[in-house]
Amino acid sequence: GDHRELHSFPTRRSSDLWDLARGVYLHGFWCYEWSDETLKAATYDPETRELRLAAKHGYGIGNPRQKDAKREFYAIHVFEELDRPGEYYLDRQNQKLYFWPPGDLDKTPVFLSLCRNPLLKATGSSHLVLRDLVFENGCGNAVELQDCRQTRVEKCLVRNMGLSGVMSSGGADNHVVRCEITRVGVRAVGMTAGDRKTLASGNCSVVGNQLHELGRYDWQNGRGVNLGGCGNRVAHNLIHHCPTGGVSYSGNEHLLELNEVHHVCLVYGDVGVFYTGRDWASQGNVVRWNYIHSIVNRPGGSGSQAIYLDDCDSGDTVVGNIVFGGVGRGVLLGGGRDNTIRGNLFIGLPKGIHVDARGPRAITLDRPGSWNLRARAEEVDYLSPLWRERYPRLARVLDEEPLLPMGNVLRDNIFVGCKEPFALAKDVKEEWL
């Protein structure tokens, strides 16, 4: 049917008074628990409780996996609901801002920023040190580093930014160290460096930072760290209060170790505290010695996992992590190959390690799209002599039942008070492990 239409719209009677001509928007999880979107309301009939949206959601309305599943959403930018301190309404047509201050403006100042550019941007710089600085109250990113080398952002405070804290792309030997990054619109740190084809390390790091209260504007990307490229490190960070997971990574030979992560996955489902996925060639990454606790596991869908090797991610090592309560699963191995899950401690979880075989249902080897894992591997020249030597099992993937989760090693893990230590999906055979 028409995905722009909702029936039996459950809402307060005050919605009957909303002036949709001013522009009313609804933000929520319209279909899946891992995809939120803001959609404009077009019309609303208070008699039938029928609402029509101005645009279609990418996945439609209603979860096809759960019949009659209730979808969560809320209204934003509603002039008639401006009724408590801290709220505001922007009348774009008349260029007027209505704002109810949360307190005494003489004691607590309010800032309005018009700066859409990064507060500091460096391109091609080297031996640059940013130390003991405060970056705050911008509409965009706080710091952007492009193709820089040997730079350090150290002991800085980044807060109240519209987008992200520190974004570093390209170059090598760049480091974000002992900073506090909080109350930003998207992620705290985005770091991409290194060459996957040549497996040259970026040698960049995110170390010893406090990253919290993130994703105020963009829930889906509101993590502590997004890491990409080859040969970078995320260590000794304290990450908490994120709408989605704590760290996501892609690429090769990254080291994610000795981090403490708690109170993340606050609003998202089917999410990982440490997350990667959908790439056979994303190999050689190590997630070790992290302490993961007090995570939110929202009901419905796939919930949250401490380490999520999603959509046939392969060739990673998960070792020596402590996972204490909160998450639905300690490790979700989603159909991947040649992963090692060893020596982890899982305490008080519904499921310790969960393995499924989604490959036959999802992977394609001859059609375009993100599920063509052979094409993704070919992009990094996975059959080159260098890659054959580094990842010999990957070089043989097409010869060894490529769609099945084979070659994984699960050993020496400890489960305390877990309802189901090992959860194997019905289509997984024990001899594959």
Mark where each language-model region is:
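Intrinsically disordered, low-complexity boundary segments flanking structured domains
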Residues: 13-16, 75-77, 83-87, 105-108, ...
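Transmembrane beta-barrel wall of Gram-negative outer-membrane proteins
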Residues: 148-154, 173-177
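Extracellular polysaccharide-degrading/modifying enzymes targeting complex plant/algal/animal polysaccharides
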Residues: 1, 8-147, 152, 159, ...
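Glycine- and acidic/polar-rich repeat regions and solenoidal domains
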Residues: 140-145, 159-169, 182-433
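A short catalytic or substrate-binding loop motif that flags glycine-/basic-rich loops and adjacent residues
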Residues: 32-35, 81-82, 181, 239, ...
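Hydrophobic (often cysteine-bearing) scaffold residues that line and stabilize catalytic clefts
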Residues: 6, 126, 149, 172, ...
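Conserved beta-strand immediately N-terminal to the Walker
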Residues: 129, 175, 205
